[in-house]
Amino acid sequence: MEQTYQYAWIIPFLPLPVPMLIGLGLLLFPTATKSLRRMWSFQSVLLLSIVMIFSMNLSIQQINSSYVYQYVWSWIINNDFSLEFGYLIDPLTSIMLILITTVGIMVLIYSDNYMSHDHGYLRFFAYMSFFSTSMLGLVTSSNLIQIYIFWELVGICSYLLIGFWFTRPVAAKACQKAFVTNRVGDFGLLLGILGFYWITGSFEFRDLFQIFNNLISNNEVNFLFVTLCAILLFAGAIAKSAQFPLHVWLPDAMEGPTPISALIHAATMVAAGIFLVARLMPLFIVIPHIMNFISLIGIITVFLGATLALAQKDIKRGLAYSTMSQLGYMMLALGMGSYRSALFHLITHAYSKALLFLGSGSVIHSMETLVGYCPKKSQNMVLMGGLTKHLPITKNSFLLGTLSLCGIPPLACFWSKDEILNDSWLYSPIFGIIAWSTAGLTAFYMCRIYLLTFEGHLNVHFQNYSGKRNTPFYSISLWGKEGSKISNKNFSLVTLLKMKKNPRPSFFSNNKVYKIDENVRNMIQPFLSIPHFGNTKTYSYPYESDNTMLFPILILILFTLFVGFLGIPFNQDVDILSKWLNPSINLLHQNSNNSIDWYEFSKDAFFSVSIASFGIFIAFFLYKPVYSSFQNLEFLNTFVKMGPNRIFYDKIKNSIYDWSYNRGYIDAFYGRFLTAGIRKLANFAHFFDRRIIDAIPNGVGLMSFFGAEVIKSVGGGRISSYLFFYFSYVAIFLLIYYFFNV
């Protein structure tokens, strides 16, 4: 066992040869490297698989013995200061290693096909491997200095991948937004690290916690200063994990390739903030009010993320706000002291959200065969619908991910979210009400995304690709579907109802292609050439993705089905997660053995499932396929006859829609007051620098120039000039003498 831990230092460096070799290959042998580019995906998967096997071995040993291993190398700069570098293997590290490697491998396999026709294929895999290296280094760090170094490397990789298609102005702007927003949090993190070093004199976690606890117990610290330093540390996690108010970068980060969205949202960048707070829990729990502040930020993010997801039309942005809300649940659990529940939800959410993002990538991939490469169209749920027949495997996997996130048993997120909801009641009734209400909102917006994407008819056939309407009946329902007031006499309602029964080509058959224009592709392929933005070749119907993309989705289905059983709290003997985290930090249940009886569990589960079911019912009520509503005209007429009540209902609905679709006006507020204010300040500083600061030396130079010109004209060699200036000076001196002696 000791030997296994001794070689754990190699874990972060195993994926590193891939970006280094790709860079050397492009520099020395560019043609050969590009022609053999597909082999780099195999090497990336192979190296990360080795890390996964190593991590599983460490995790098994952690479960059996709860052994904490730390190794440190000391670099002595002088007698008073030294830097220590090392690695720390404990239950938290082993959990994160498993998460990063398993999700990372699935994303890499998926990306091999998804990015196969992209000119940036090599660059993508170089970034991804370096991303894995940075995240693995972060979770194995033994001190705050290493944490900060790898923290910045994780951020750099995220910015590179968010702005991967940097020739698109929207992607470049999203990259810049993520960078600027995270700069705020990272600066706070750096100040917090320096503050605690000034207090304790150490960066090492073990020494830092021990010294700080002694100072707190002896009342030898300034609590105001300590609280400020703790908030600054937490600011880094706020930005990285997209917590309010530094959450604005996360939806725009969807401009990157879909595989990287899956990795960022499941196991890397946003998980880094949760990991940091979990790692520093022994520090935070002894500081008054800081845990309350963490839970407050968490509950605000929970509710805000859920409300902003209600009316999004972009499928990836809807999932992004879902991630924001679920991260809020994790932060809420950490703030309440439910260490185990937070990490449990981090695990279950990672696999469910990776499944949803890879499923959305499959949907986007299929929609690109209809509308060409244009994210505003291929990711727009307005143009989707009716994909159940064409993408059955993707549909079933997306449904499982949706139900898991809704909290439906026995799927993964049910077990973890239920613990957080129960703990929220013990912590604060107000927080409990908000958390339980948000669980219903989660079920609503996730079911909405599923219904708009897979149920009903393929709405791209109801309007052209430029967005111009050619029929008034392309709207499924409110929120996400525009209605049309233009009447079309040639359109028959009976025709619309019969469209459901018309046969459509199956994705299993490639013998026939149904053209919708003359630019149909000559060869059916499961991927597009991303760099060809002008490509207008389309098919009439989407089809299922290639097996290389479906394989990771199927594996993630297994994780979504069974990973929740790791933390079932019925019996201590089968509760693997509690053994893994023993001794865990749980302020709400300090004397608990993390096991509950059947009656208590059934009561709480019934309540949570009822709320989730209510949200699902409302979503089905509002977003069921359009033809089912048309077939029940009497049901529709009841809403028409509502009169004034309907007007009031529409006002409420539109207000909620505007709030959600406009991102709670938070981005607009930042743009108008912060961004505009900073730009005005920058313009004023520019004006002051150029017109005042620069004007002083420039004015002296001009005065010297004109003075020299005058002197030069005097000494021009003409006697008349000499006489003129001579008599002028004599006259001036005489006048001065006269006035002073009068």
Swiss-Prot record:
Region forming the signal peptide: none
Taxon lineage: Eukaryota, Viridiplantae, Streptophyta, Embryophyta, Tracheophyta
Location relative to the cell: Plastid, Chloroplast thylakoid membrane
GO BP terms, alphabetized: ATP synthesis coupled electron transport
Membrane topology value: Multi-pass membrane protein
GO cellular component: chloroplast thylakoid membrane
Species this chain originates from: Lactuca sativa
Keywords attached to this entry: Chloroplast, Membrane, NAD, NADP, Plastid, Plastoquinone, Quinone, Thylakoid, Translocase, Transmembrane, Transmembrane helix, Transport
GO molecular function, one term: quinone binding
A Pfam family annotated for this UniProt entry: Proton_antipo_C
InterPro entries for the chain: NADH_UbQ_OxRdtase_chlpt_su5_C, NADHpl_OxRdtase_5_subgr, ND/Mrp_TM, NU5C-like, Proton_antipo_N
Gene: ndhF
EC numbers: 7.1.1.-
Protein name: NAD(P)H-quinone oxidoreductase subunit 5, chloroplastic
